[in-house]
A protein has these predicted regions:
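Detector for Asparagine
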Residues: 3, 19, 56, 76, ...
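Catalytic cores of nucleophile-dependent amide-cleaving enzymes
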Residues: 26, 33-116
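Caspase-like cysteine protease fold
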Residues: 107-152
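Generic detector of well-ordered alpha-helical segments enriched in charged/polar residues
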Residues: 6-10, 61, 65-68, 137
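Glycine-rich short-loop/terminal segments
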Residues: 1-51, 150-152
């Protein structure tokens, strides 16, 4: 679907409240690429804005920034695509999205075969980018305590 990233974001923002904990995308991917509404092997050389990658991230960041309004204080994004977080291009893409949306963004480093219960978890190692280039400890310490819980 052409302009599928815009359509997906519009649908999500229209349906979600302001306290989303996890937003998970499933689709085709490779290092530094997350397909949102595209099929496998389109390969026509035209940017249909149906995937997020290094060639279109600057055009799509204003669209993706609209997702910031749906997240609660511990919100995060996961791309359940094959290898999206692999290599420098994958890590750079995830960091740009984390900085733009203001939540941690995680993606797989290897192929994700899916099927059955594996569809709902990462298969193998992942990379997580935190807003501002922070790490897990610093990001968590900047979050409010969960109501009714205190840190140990």
């Amino acid at each position: 679907m052409s302009n599928g990233v815009e359509q997906a974001v519009s649908d999500i923002v229209g349906a979600a409240g302001g306290n989303v904990f996890l937003l998970r995308f499933h689709g085709y991917g490779t290092s530094g690429v997350a397909g949102i509404s595209d099929g496998h092997g389109l390969g026509d050389g035209i940017d249909h804005r149906s995937s997020i990658d290094s060639s279109n991230i600057h055009q799509l960041l204003p669209v993706l920034r609209r997702l910031a309004s749906i997240f609660g204080p511990y919100g995060n994004i996961q791309f359940m695509h094959c290898s999206t977080g692999r290599g420098a291009s994958g890590q750079r893409l995830l960091q740009q999205i984390a900085d733009g949306v203001g939540v941690p963004v995680t993606a797989a480093l290897r192929d994700q075969l899916g099927g059955g219960a594996n569809t709902f978890k990462f298969e193998g190692p992942t990379f997580t980018a935190f807003p501002g280039g922070n790490n897990l400890r610093s990001w968590c310490s900047s979050r409010p305590d969960f109501p009714g819980f205190t840190p140990a």
